[in-house]
């Protein structure tokens, strides 16, 4: 949480001077719910979402847009190990989610690119879930 805070505080004045800028924070599906054994991680991600929304409110009128993506399970080595366990809660829940698969890193990158683009010019302080519907239920 410290790094995004410090980076935002450094870059926002430059963006305001330019009259425009976009920040996309990478949070997590843990930003909106509690998880097993993740006190520090979940607390930090909740904090990052709060930081995103508050900074968006504080700086949006100066032309700076600040949003966040909330990735769910993404196809990484860690998730592959988890999904190899049929009875793991993540494996079971993913099987019930609309996408029924982990996301690909490129799918998160595309969401970030969208939020950073002019096509998202009316989006401020948003938390875009990129999770294949994992957090619907």
Roles of regions detected by a PLM:
Residues 97-108, 119:
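A conserved structural motif in NAD(P)-dependent oxidoreductases
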Residues 61, 73-96:
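A glycine/serine/threonine-rich, flexible loop-to-helix segment
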Residues 60, 65, 123-125:
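Short, small/polar-rich loop/turn modules that mediate ligand/substrate recognition or access, typified
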Residues 34-42, 54, 82:
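Active-site loop-to-helix junction immediately N-terminal to the catalytic Tyr of the SDR YXXXK motif
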Residues 8, 44, 52:
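Active-site helix of classical SDR
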Residues 33, 112-113, 124-137:
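Short C-terminal tail/terminal secondary-structure segment
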Residues 28:
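Residue(s) in the substrate-gating loop at a strand-loop-helix junction
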